[in-house]
Amino acid sequence: ARVAAGSGRPMALQSWPCFEPGTWASVGAEADRWRAEAGEPPPILAVDRDEGAVASARANAERAGVVEAIEWRTGAISDLLPPSSGGGPGLLLTNPPWGGRLSAGGDLRNLYATLGRVAREQFAGWRIGVLVAERALARQIRPGLSEALQLEPGGRRAWLLTGPVDR
């Protein structure tokens, strides 16, 4: 959709005493230039097995004005296919369950292994990014993923691990 976060609404920083409207306008013009040069965005596919999660994400996308840029599906990881709009290799970005609250402490190794199998079968040549709370689980998807980012959502340590998807 190529829409900057917060565009189309006033930002709190605009009321700061040190705010410089000229600099703000310059940054906005540069973003518009980049957007024009970037061309069409890659296809975006949002999938979850829970219809409520998909509906909630869709409502958020609607409020952000990007709902039409996303292909929406409900389904299991084992049935995951690339976006129907094609577009060639892209990025498979996933936030699979971490355990604890979502799986009541169940064993997630099979789920992560299934994600790895589907990635190899359906997304070979793509890149993958996986947000995990346990790096060992990510090895079920693909050994050797590299740490791209460490963060603490909700006070829990997590890592975004990335790498190529090989067959």
Locate predicted features.
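Conserved S-adenosyl-L-methionine
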Residues: 1-79
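C-terminal catalytic and target-recognition region of SAM-dependent MTase-like enzymes
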Residues: 75-167
